[in-house]
A protein has these predicted regions:
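Active-site mouth of glycoside hydrolases
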Residues: 1-109, 115-133, 143-165
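Conserved active-site aspartate in kinases
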Residues: 138
Length: 165
């Protein structure tokens, strides 16, 4: 193994954040448990659950159970997954609600909307088989300010001009 590889880079074993994460969840739920707008608890945003799947599972699933124990109303618990290989991700499928940040055709399969649509549908088929509710929590595209094209192209401001759609 080289530098920056292997077990020593496993963020779930390297960084001592578990106690802090639990305290943040305690504070969040104690503060907001009676707020009428709370429909579920999100424990995090875009964690890497793909590269160290067993460690990620141990970390997130135990926090999932911890969060459920804290909430007297037993609302759904989740986190938001981003761009992880959904077939390798053994954590997201254990959440009560599958929350996905996805950018098919932008960060994945850039500019190839036909391939992006196909890949997105494959992923949706996968999640449907998990028998969990799915929420698309982010989607979209980006532009570089000042780049203009007659026909909307990637990175031009026109590609993100939703008024033209």
């Amino acid at each position: 193994m080289g530098i920056g590889a292997g077990e020593s880079c496993d963020p779930y074993k390297t960084f001592p954040i578990r106690e802090h994460h639990e305290q943040v969840l305690r504070d969040l739920i104690a503060r907001d448990k009676n707020h009428p707008c709370i429909v579920m608890w999100s424990m995090g945003n875009e964690p890497d659950t793909e590269h160290f799947p067993e460690s990620a599972y141990d970390y997130w699933h135990s926090l999932y159970e911890f969060t459920h124990r804290l909430d007297p109303q037993n609302r759904p618990v989740t986190f938001v997954c981003c761009q992880n290989n959904y077939e390798k991700d053994i954590v997201t499928r254990t959440m009560d609600v599958v929350c996905l940040n996805r950018y098919y055709g932008w960060y994945n399969l850039s500019g190839d909307l036909e391939a992006a649509s196909y890949a997105w549908n494959l992923e949706l088929d996968f999640w449907e088989k998990q028998n969990k509710p799915v929420m698309i929590t982010e989607y979209g595209a980006d532009a570089v300010a000042g780049i203009h094209e007659c026909v909307p192209e990637m990175f031009s401001e026109e590609v993100t001009n939703w008024e033209q759609l």
